[in-house]
Amino acid sequence: GCYLTPGLIDTHVHYSQTGWADGRPDARDVRAEFPYAQAMADNQAHPERFHRAFLHSGVTAVFDVGGYPWTRGLAAACEHDLRAPYVAAAGALLATYDPKVLMLPDQSQFVFPKDGEEARAAVRSHRAFGSAAIKVWLIETPERSLASLVPIVMAAGDEARRVGLPLIVHSTTLATAKVAVAAGAQVLVHSVEDHEVDDEFVAAMVKQGTFYCPTLTVR
């Protein structure tokens, strides 16, 4: 006989990416042959390509954890469409690092708060425009130490709680992941890569109730 099982939930997707180099010129730059602007225009015009891929894989709900502003509209567009999964989308990322090549002339998928007050303002703006979560792209650089970024992340987390949105964080080092959890992150969207996680980190996650999304990659 036949039976139905609950659909899978993919907690880390990006409708603003393609799954290939044309959507991430910061990883491999193929823009000379495959223009980034065209790839992004195609994504916006034809999200049904991804809808089909998800549904055919048994995925009936997805969490878009950061992208161009138009991704926020997918939730309403897909809610009653049987040809699409349920979508929750964070919208633009609050970023501590500027990748430059991942932006378009007329829109950006990043906001760059310089301090805690700007982070709070960005959170309020995201809430007003319908974001389902606040995504912080927490990346240390030689120009910006983790210590200098802590006030921004903490302010974003505090303001997210105030407006009733979950805080989700890209933090791939143990040090940044600990800061993210301390700021109230409900989801870490990547595994820690530089060290084995320690008891302190695990205890903090359990206390906070943080979900750990490994975001495994098949190579």
Which functions belong to the PLM regions below?
Residues 17-43, 91, 95-108, 208-219:
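Active-site gating loops and adjacent loop-to-helix segments of metal-dependent hydrolytic enzymes
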Residues 7-13, 62-64, 87-91, 134-136, ...:
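Hydrophobic faces of well-ordered beta-strands that scaffold small-molecule active sites
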Residues 3-78, 182-183:
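Metal-associated gating/positioning segment near the N- to mid-region
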Residues 64-108, 113-118:
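Mid-domain alpha/beta scaffold segments of enzyme catalytic cores
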Residues 101-158:
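Active-site gating/metal-coordination segments in enzymes
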Residues 59-61, 82-87, 130-132, 161-165, ...:
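Short, well-ordered coil/turn segments that N-cap beta-strands
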Residues 43-53, 110-127, 171-178:
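Short, acidic/polar
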Residues 97, 137-219:
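Active-site core of metal-dependent hydrolases
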